[in-house]
């Protein structure tokens, strides 16, 4: 079944411009408060100009172009401008440093880079010291260094016509993007995403939160991340809604932005919810138009209830990963919600729990969450130039091994337990990091928490807790361990405590555990 009607991204944008014309498509707010607005017609013209810019710089179908940008209009222009000419976007996490950025450039084979002056010195060094295929850099800033091989993105774009100059034949099976995974435990892998993947993601995510063309979807998630692209942007555009892209998250500013833009849909991760809850209560906390808050793992029931009560919202759970493109398990429109369940499998997917021998498990038993989809259509196509890694997680019949543990109840509701790599083996017992973190997070003095396993000669692994305290608080080891002993089984109580000012996180809010080992 062809859900998207054979429509690639070039056709999508031409149709959106025709149908929605002067309706607002995109609003971007910078950290400095500068706001840019584009109608569907204007945005399609900017996308065409950007496509023509790339063509004049020698980019052709199949070429890879890297983007190292914070949330900004240029990211959207480049993403779809490249797609229109059959080129491939390689977004780079804007928080990565030289070594990691160079590694992605090398492994993606990108020949052109779009970035800002903030990151340019790093790429100067990469060009001098690393072997890459990079031959040109476009900077989005007005002021340019007097260097060869560097151009002004804005100046070149504005010189281009608003109609497309180069339109090679496209297929929905063509690669549109190579998105490198966050690599919190190992080197990132390049997830190959097709035009079909992105078009399907738009329809699916719009269905998931029942989007209409009068909706306003606001996100602070980074544009180089799958959530922003496929759960937010593609959903909003596919429905003809308005997409609001905020440059960076600020707990102090977020709720005001929700109110200012009259957002009806937004998305949150646990870090956002916890930082919003420590903001001073306001009489305007419930003055908003939000219908749904898309939510991604993991939060204790106490935290969830407190957030929903204070702000008068409900959470729409969604479970997925870069490889699944969208939240393939989640709450369904007009369906019952069963916290702490992560929901049921969405349309076009199958899900089941399997044991260590790849056999399905009955309801109630914990095993690996496995998802069945169609590679290159409803799930990722493959890992770029890495068939061994692809074969490790993706079976020939479309079953994807997520590496997450969970269980399912009799009604098909799934429950997340933990990442397999986040299970601590302690004296013959398996201990879930997420379970402990949810318990410890309820301590009134603790703002942020992560637990990890460290080598122990007697018990396989010992448990160490890293905590960030609320401002002005102090916490003794005696108080911490007493709290743990009162709220969890003895074998789950951490052996060590370290209080820190912050925890290392990637762009999507996930703890970078390898930095805490």
From Swiss-Prot:
Keywords tagged on the record: Ligase
InterPro entries: AMP-bd_C (IPR025110), AMP-bd_C_sf (IPR045851), AMP-binding_CS (IPR020845), AMP-dep_synth/lig_dom (IPR000873), ANL_N_sf (IPR042099), CaiC (IPR023456)
Pathway listed: Amine and polyamine metabolism; carnitine metabolism
Example GO BP: fatty acid metabolic process
Origin: domain of life: Bacteria
EC number: 6.2.1.48
Pfam families: AMP-binding, AMP-binding_C
GO terms for MF: carnitine-CoA ligase activity; crotonobetaine-CoA ligase activity; medium-chain fatty acid-CoA ligase activity
Reaction catalysis annotation: 4-(trimethylamino)butanoate + ATP + CoA = 4-(trimethylamino)butanoyl-CoA + AMP + diphosphate; crotonobetaine + ATP + CoA = crotonobetainyl-CoA + AMP + diphosphate; (R)-carnitine + ATP + CoA = (R)-carnitinyl-CoA + AMP + diphosphate
CDD domains: FACL_DitJ_like
Purpose: Catalyzes the transfer of CoA to carnitine, generating the initial carnitinyl-CoA needed for the CaiB reaction cycle. Also has activity toward crotonobetaine and gamma-butyrobetaine.
PANTHER family assigned to the protein according to its UniProt record, in alphabetical order: ACYL-COA SYNTHETASE, MEDIUM-CHAIN ACYL-COA LIGASE ACSF2, MITOCHONDRIAL
Protein family: Belongs to the ATP-dependent AMP-binding enzyme family.
Name used for this protein in its record: Crotonobetaine/carnitine--CoA ligase
Organism field: Escherichia coli (strain 55989 / EAEC)
């Amino acid at each position: 079944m062809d859900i998207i009607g054979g429509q690639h991204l070039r056709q999508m944008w031409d149709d959106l411009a025709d149908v929605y014309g002067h309706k607002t498509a995109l609003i971007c707010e910078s950290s400095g408060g500068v706001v840019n607005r584009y109608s569907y017609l204007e945005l399609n013209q900017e996308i065409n100009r950007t496509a023509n810019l790339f063509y004049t710089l020698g980019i052709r179908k199949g070429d890879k172009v890297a983007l190292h940008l914070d949330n900004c209009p240029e990211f959207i222009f480049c993403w779809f401008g490249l797609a229109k000419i059959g080129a491939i976007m390689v977004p780079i996490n804007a928080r990565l440093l030289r070594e990691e950025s160079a590694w992605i450039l090398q492994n993606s084979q990108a020949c052109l880079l779009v970035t800002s002056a903030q990151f340019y010195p790093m790429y100067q060094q990469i060009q001098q010291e690393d072997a890459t295929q990079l031959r040109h850099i476009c900077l989005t800033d007005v002021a340019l260094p007097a260097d060869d091989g560097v151009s002004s993105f804005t100046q070149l774009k504005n010189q281009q016509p608003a109609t497309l100059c180069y339109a090679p034949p496209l297929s929905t099976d063509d690669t549109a993007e190579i998105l490198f995974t966050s690599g919190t435990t190992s080197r990132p892998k390049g997830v190959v995403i097709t035009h079909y993947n992105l078009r399907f993601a738009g329809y699916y995510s719009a269905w998931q939160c029942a989007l209409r063309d009068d909706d306003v979807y606001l996100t602070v998630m980074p544009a180089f991340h799958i959530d922003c692209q496929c759960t937010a942007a593609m959903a909003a555009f596919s429905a003809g809604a308005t997409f609001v892209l905020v440059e960076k998250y600020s707990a102090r500013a977020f709720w005001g932005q929700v109110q200012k833009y009259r957002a009806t849909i937004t998305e949150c991760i646990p870090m956002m919810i916890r930082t919003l809850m420590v903001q001073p209560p306001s009489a305007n906390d419930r003055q908003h138009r939000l219908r749904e808050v898309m939510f991604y793992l993991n939060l204790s029931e106490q935290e969830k209830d407190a957030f929903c009560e204070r702000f008068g919202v409900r959470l729409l759970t969604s479970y997925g990963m870069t490889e699944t493109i969208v939240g393939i398990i989640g709450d369904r429109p007009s369906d019952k919600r069963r916290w702490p369940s992560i929901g049921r499998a969405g349309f076009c997917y199958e899900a089941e729990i399997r044991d260590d021998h790849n056999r399905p498990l009955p309801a109630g038993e914990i095993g690996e969450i496995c998802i069945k989809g169609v590679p290159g259509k409803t799930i990722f196509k493959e890992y770029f130039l890495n068939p061994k890694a692809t074969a490790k997680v993706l079976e020939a019949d479309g079953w994807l091994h997520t590496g997450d543990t969970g269980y399912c109840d009799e009604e098909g509701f799934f429950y997340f337990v933990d990442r397999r790599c986040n299970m601590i083996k302690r004296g013959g017992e398996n201990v879930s990091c997420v379970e402990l973190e949810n318990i410890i997070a309820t301590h009134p003095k603790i703002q942020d928490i992560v637990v990890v396993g460290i080598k122990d000669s007697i018990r396989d692994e010992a448990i160490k807790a890293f905590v960030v305290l609320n401002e002005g608080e102090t916490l003794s080891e005696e108080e911490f361990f007493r709290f743990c002993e009162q709220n969890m089984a003895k074998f789950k109580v951490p052996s060590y405590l370290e209080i820190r000012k912050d925890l290392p996180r990637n762009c999507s809010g996930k703890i970078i555990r390898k930095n805490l080992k």
